[in-house]
């Protein structure tokens, strides 16, 4: 495996003025990225705890990542948009020695020695630093939601990141020194899919401003100003962008590669993208945070669309061996698997196994292997029981999306006394709803040919678009709040 830091330094030495990172009007060249990260690494040197990387989309967040990797301590990205109580939970769990605050704000909850961008810019520390990171060191820890309300810190090993990056570069058909687009916040591991493959191939990482997440017109302006070659995002974010009629190959001929991860890629969205960008390479990938971003991939073509009404997630990558339990739960084994949850032995023991030096992770996803392809069939914890029948909400959503009247759909269970009493479908219709009763009848008639009566939602709520979280995923919680009043 090729060391990522060495690749970055070699490219910076050969192309010092090439742009490494761009966010709106802020840019850093490769030389600046390596110099500034070395100055930060000098300050972190010797630390045995991960550095808290605090902020939002900005080039200096990348400086923080590379600096922490060089120092060998790794980093924990914390987004400023999350609630203060959650920030405190993460800080208390990490107990950091150092915090790199890339914002102009000060936060009382930040503990440890705090560095700012200005501290690094004005530092007299040397701009040369020999990387200290080892293959078995934790390179980053990303906190995900926990069922108890306490976030879980997923620890990823440096060797796992290097292996993932090499795999991404093998998939990449666009070549080196490309313009990459990253939509995901740094606290969401989808960002890893853009950051390291981009920089390891001498590309320019273009960061989508958080204000663009629910405003495709602003993104349109960005794409017009900067010809993007490779787009990394969630399917939900892409679906929102497809509302722009100008998002097509004729308008944006430079866009020749797409990577999707983080959610199921709906057939209709993939079909629209293939139609609009017939020359582009489009990848559907799958993977949990606990297995280093993604463990499978498939190139979506017209042939694949014709063959599969529900898209597969493809075949496993190096470092990931997939299997299922008797109940159909997907299990991942190999180098890609996380080192476990930070300071949470109980939760780690529930889903990880490290016997005989082999790491395995029970994903909680239902899956099947068919015709040489892996298919994700929803979450085990998205199962509900209604009138004695056990069912998968995502199965109902998949069938809804196949209706000619439905563009996007989420199914929300309605509870009474902790019991599901009926289902409501949140629907983005393909046409304006002028007759509520007629549209409801049409959709239900569509479903009756594919689902038993007990799985059909009692009623539907019409939405212009489904709200997204800051990560660009569908915000199920917000939809439920809207529906339940």
From Swiss-Prot:
What GO annotations for molecular function exist for this entry?
Answer: ATP binding; D-alanine [D-alanyl carrier protein] ligase activity
Cite the binding residues for ATP. Answer: 144-145, 284-289, 365, 473
**Domain of life the protein comes from:** Bacteria
**Record-listed D-alanine binding positions:** 189, 293, 473
Record bears the keyword Ubl conjugation: no
Which family does the similarity line name?
Belongs to the ATP-dependent AMP-binding enzyme family. DltA subfamily.
Descriptive protein name = D-alanine--D-alanyl carrier protein ligase
């Amino acid at each position: 495996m090729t060391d990522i830091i060495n690749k970055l330094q070699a490219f910076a030495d050969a192309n010092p003025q090439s742009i490494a990172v761009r966010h709106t009007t802020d840019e850093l060249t490769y030389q600046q990225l390596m110099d500034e990260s070395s100055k930060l690494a000098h300050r972190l040197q010797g630390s045995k705890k991960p550095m808290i990387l605090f902020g939002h989309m900005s080039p200096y967040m990348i400086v923080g990542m590379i600096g922490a990797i060089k120092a060998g301590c790794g980093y924990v990205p914390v987004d400023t948009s999350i609630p203060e109580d959650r920030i405190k939970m993460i800080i208390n769990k990490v107990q950091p020695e150092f915090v790199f605050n890339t914002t102009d704000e000060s936060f009382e909850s930040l503990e440890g020695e705090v560095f700012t961008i200005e501290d690094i810019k004005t530092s007299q520390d040397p701009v040369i630093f020999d990387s200290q990171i080892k293959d078995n060191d934790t390179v980053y820890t990303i906190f995900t939601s926990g069922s108890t309300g306490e976030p879980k810190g997923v620890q990823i090993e440096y060797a796992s990141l290097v292996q993932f990056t090499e795999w991404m570069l093998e998939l990449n058909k666009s070549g080196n020194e490309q313009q990459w687009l990253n939509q995901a916040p740094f606290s969401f591991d989808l960002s890893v899919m853009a950051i390291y493959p981009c920089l390891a191939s001498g590309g320019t990482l273009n960061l989508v401003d958080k204000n663009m997440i629910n405003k495709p017109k602003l993104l349109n302006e960005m794409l017009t100003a900067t010809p993007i070659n490779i787009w990394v995002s969630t399917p939900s974010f892409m679906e929102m962008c497809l509302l722009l009629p100008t998002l097509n190959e004729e308008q944006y001929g430079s866009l020749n590669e797409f990577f999707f991860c983080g959610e199921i890629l709906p057939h209709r969205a993939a079909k629209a993208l293939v139609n609009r960008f017939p020359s582009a390479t489009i990848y559907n990938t799958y993977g949990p945070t606990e297995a280093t971003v993604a463990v499978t991939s498939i190139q979506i073509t017209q042939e694949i669309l014709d063959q599969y009404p529900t898209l597969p997630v493809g075949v496993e990558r190096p470092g990931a061996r997939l299997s299922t339990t008797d109940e159909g739960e997907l299990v991942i084994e190999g180098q890609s698997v996380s080192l476990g949850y930070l300071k949470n032995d109980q939760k780690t023991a529930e889903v990880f196994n490290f016997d005989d030096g082999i790491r395995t992770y029970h994903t909680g996803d239902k899956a099947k292997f068919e015709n040489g392809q892996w298919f994700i069939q929803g979450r085990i914890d998205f199962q509900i029981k209604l009138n004695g029948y056990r069912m998968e909400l995502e199965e109902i959503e998949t069938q809804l999306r196949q209706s000619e009247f439905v563009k996007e759909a989420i199914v929300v269970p309605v509870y009474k006394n902790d019991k599901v009493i009926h289902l409501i479908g949140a629907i983005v219709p393909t046409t304006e709803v002028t007759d509520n009763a007629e549209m409801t009848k049409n959709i239900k008639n569509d479903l009756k040919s594919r689902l038993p009566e007990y799985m059909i939602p009692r009623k539907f709520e019409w939405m212009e678009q489904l709200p997204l979280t800051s990560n660009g995923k569908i915000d199920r919680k917000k939809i439920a709040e809207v529906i339940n009043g």
